[in-house]
Amino acid sequence: MKTLDELITERRSVRKYLDREVEPAKIAMLAEALRLAPSACNAQPWRIIFVTEKALKDKVTSEGLGGVVPNTWAKSAPVMIVACSELSLFTHKLAESVQGVNFHLIDIGIALEHLVLKATDIGLGTCYIGWFNEKPIKKLLNIPSSWKVDCLITLGYPEVVPEATPRKPANEITFINKV
């Protein structure tokens, strides 16, 4: 088993996948990682859809991606994860009205990081996609109006594991006590 530091260091945005099914047992492991993620007041606002059926995944990809950034590479992924937030939760509505903070986005970000690190741990690759057309995705997947599609994540066995991309030094992005 790899350490957390190794998983954080090894995680990459994968854009080329093998034509290989992701086993249901591995999807269950990812679901468990999501389930254990912390959230504001333990509200667990995320609703995650694993689209594994090829015909449906292809429709989600063709109808949901496009526009300025078409992300055509996403079609090679055997699984498309559709990450949604339940917007009708009282805790999150209160926080947004009082503090102007969208806690559902913070919560889902934490949960999805659990997912991508677990995916890395079990030999799977992922890539976040933030540019998509929500309306056709909601229609194709019968997503309720009270849910917001926050992002998509491709999932599968990497055909190519990309090299690490340059990162800013820690002293440029972190501060102790004052800026």
Predicted regions located by residue number:
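C-terminal helix-cap and adjacent tail motif
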Residues: L4-V14, E23, L89, C151-V179
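A structural motif
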Residues: I27-R35
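Glycine/small-residue-rich phosphate/adenosyl-binding loop
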Residues: N42-A111
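Short secondary-structure junction motifs
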Residues: A43-W46, L124, D150
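Small-aliphatic-rich amphipathic alpha-helix that forms the alpha element of a beta-alpha
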Residues: L34-R35, I81, E96-L140
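Short secondary-structure boundary segments
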Residues: S85, W131, Y157
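A glycine-rich helix N-cap at a beta->alpha junction
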Residues: P70-M80, N142-A164
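Alpha-helix/helix-capping structural signal
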Residues: R12, A55, F132-K135
